[in-house]
Amino acid sequence: MRPKNYSQMEKPISITTGKFRTNNNNNHNNVWFVVPLFFILCFVLLCFDYSALFTDTDETAFSIPDVTQKSTSSEFTKDDNFSRFPDDPSPDSSCSGRYIYVHELPYRFNGDLLDNCFKITRGTEKDICPYIENYGFGPVIKNYENVLLKQSWFTTNQFMLEVIFHNKMINYRCLTNDSSLASAVFVPFYAGLDMSRYLWGFNITVRDSSSHELMDWLVVQKEWGRMSGRDHFLVSGRIAWDFRRQTDNESDWGSKLRFLPESRNMSMLSIESSSWKNDYAIPYPTCFHPRSVDEIVEWQELMRSRKREYLFTFAGAPRPEYKDSVRGKIIDECLESKKQCYLLDCNYGNVNCDNPVNVMKVFRNSVFCLQPPGDSYTRRSMFDSILAGCIPVFFHPGTAYAQYKWHLPKNHSSYSVYLPVKDVKEWNIKIKERLIEIPEERVVRLREEVIRLIPKVVYADPKYGSDGSEDAFELAVKGMLERIEEVREMMRQGKDGSDGFDDRDDYKYTFSPYEEPQVLA
């Protein structure tokens, strides 16, 4: 936090005046002409000297052009009464071990991206700017068609996760402006939005430029030296693989942010983790951002009371370009099952699957929601299905089980059905038959567990959470703090904090850890 910028009249400069005496009456007028002039000169000199103590020299801000020093706080919160850094509580308060320090990055790394949102594209949409409003939640949904609650539903873009998380962090109750108290350091770089500007038609030098500039800035900050960056973390609304380009071939996808030597010391939270141990998955943002516990409870009760018309549902489009995709088989079986399966066709030109009214209308009427991998392992749809109380059915462990360890139960059979498909050529699953086999008692238990998970996978209003409730943000912060503490404990014991920190673990995406057959009873 920058020191207060005092005006000349506000600066706490104290001048003590004395009484001058003279025995020369003839010089009296001259003396009293000189004395005021002397004091005026002293005052001016003191002002210039003292003002140096109050120059805008934020210890977290490296010497950079003035344009990058623009304060970002007002860009991320609409609450004029909010104090970015509350008074640090006493060391024995509930914030002990939970303090987080937020770097005030140069403006080009976050706020400037929002100011120039028209330069960012989703690939399927020309204008991402409307999604920035309302803390990054996007426009309020007004035509809820008696499907959604009358409030707290928004048209949310998954790429806005970094903006949503930043707004939530600004309102985190255990912020500190004293980095020596902090257990973790948050780096509010909008990595996904930055890279989205350069994914198509730009060379790797341009794609990697912001990553290099960020790391150059971070490593000279005093906070970096404490743990060589291993207590630092950032968040992205893109999958972690987008930041792990493994070659310098111009045709390769993404940036090399996570392969830069300094960046390997940091952790990244994103909608999908990679094979590296310092990448962690947190939920995709859904379109429900409740303002209170009462709203969550109301929604949960609505989902419990639903009479579900369809046995299973699939919302998506075929992926014929991916030879290993199971989607074609799933769509075929859904069409064969007629009234027992509902197909929400999300192919271009069909139903708008970004509209939560369309998605929730189907999911809330289905017992099971099929969740095959999409363009990558994970799908936002799985969190929409949880939100609707629809039991997710997974075909690959990388879609959920290897991902959201802080948010979903370790016992994956308690909330989902697993039908592993290692090779689509060997597809021998009859989805309808497998789902019908599950006893009604177990279906009820599964649905109840899914509904119980709803508070853990939503990003609530930034003011929400002060009552001790844990939403997706709170659980992500808790998980990150625990991981950093593990590294810190290693260092206390004289061990190398880098040992295993950024190792690669491809095993977690294989079927082997999850090969035990599920008990359907």
From Swiss-Prot:
Q: Which GO terms describe its cellular component?
A: Golgi membrane; membrane; plant-type cell wall
Kindly give the membrane topology term recorded for this protein: Single-pass type II membrane protein
Report residue spans for region: Disordered. Answer: 72-92, 492-521
Q: Where is the composition biased (Basic and acidic residues)?
A: 76-87
What does the function comment of this entry state?
Answer: Functions in xyloglucan synthesis by adding side chains to the xylosylated glucan backbone. Involved in the galactosylation of hemicellulose xyloglucan.
Q: Does the keyword Nucleotide-binding apply?
A: no
Q: Which family does this protein fall into? A: Belongs to the glycosyltransferase 47 family.
Membrane-spanning parts:
31-51
What spans does the record annotate as topological domain Lumenal, numbered to this chain?
Answer: 52-521
- Regions of this protein lying in the Cytoplasmic compartment: 1-30
Coiled-coil ranges from the UniProt annotation: none
Q: Transmembrane as a keyword? A: yes
Q: Which UniProt keywords apply?
A: Glycoprotein, Glycosyltransferase, Golgi apparatus, Membrane, Signal-anchor, Transferase, Transmembrane, Transmembrane helix
**The name this protein goes by in its record:** Probable xyloglucan galactosyltransferase GT14
Q: What class of enzyme is it?
A: transferase
Single GO BP term: protein glycosylation
Q: Give the highest taxon in the source lineage.
A: Eukaryota
Pfam short name (any one): Exostosin_GT47
Q: Where located? A: Golgi apparatus membrane
Q: In which tissues is it expressed?
A: Expressed in roots, hypocotyls, cotyledons, leaves, stems, stamens and carpels.
